[in-house]
């Protein structure tokens, strides 16, 4: 990012005595995220002229009257969100035949913070998987996904930027623990269900 504060006269709006642009390097080059314009006393002068009311401030100590100036920041949410997506998007080479698409969003921006993925749709796992989902969904935006293979589900969550995936497997029924996979490193930890909230709370912003 950079700030461009030098503009030719024909680049300025008629009301602006100076403008600073916050710019981001998009794939097509530098472009504006936000503009901050010094509108001077243009707005209040216009209001005064058309309303017939005096709009000014009297400084008693200096015995002076003056019209306040207006600074106008203008930012677009769409373009800023697009910049976040561009900065986070990566196609990572795993090996000669495998490329992983991952959206490395800051966890605060990720649509889902956690996804619960039962290893199988078999009835033996479903109740426990839903218990785990109920445990996390009240604290973080969470997704529940049981369709296709576990690898394809990991890939889907990587593509939408989910920081943590929780896999409920058949060992969970015995050891009361789940596998937690971190998005960026793909590292996995075995975490007891009764410690899961603490584990995630240490790694996800509140």
Stretch-by-stretch model annotation:
Residues 4-206:
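NTP/phosphate- and nucleic-acid-binding module
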